[in-house]
Amino acid sequence: QIAFAGGKLDAGDADAIAAALREAQEEIGLPPDHVSVIGQLEAHETVTGYQITPVLARLERRFDAVPEAGEVAEVFRVPLAFLLDAQNYRVEGRRWRGAWRKFYAVPWGPYYIWGATARILKALSDRVAE
């Protein structure tokens, strides 16, 4: 499964942005001072009922990702121009819990980005295109 760094708000988190910065540091070693937060995208609900508040930030300095063992198997990059091109998204479907579900997918090389992650990226693509 391909997903963004993230998790739930901890008691010490001021808001979703603080939680996102903390989780990115914990999961891939991204120092918070290496990014400039642009803002938040519209919240998304997963098919399993989780509420996701995507936080968009610009990487200001290069860093070497250090995946947290046991939680992150691999970190990879996809060019922003590829993700913003609506032509790269497709709608697919599969049976899940007895029902047929449709979802976005945006394959990149050997990686199959789909579900909530692809839906968030598609929402970003749509918003930039407005």
Regions found by a protein language model. Give the residues of each.
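Short, His- and charge-rich active-site/binding loops that engage polyanionic ligands
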Residues: 1-9
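Unchanged
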Residues: 8-109, 113, 122-130
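NAD(P)-dependent dehydrogenases' Rossmann-like dinucleotide-binding region
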Residues: 117
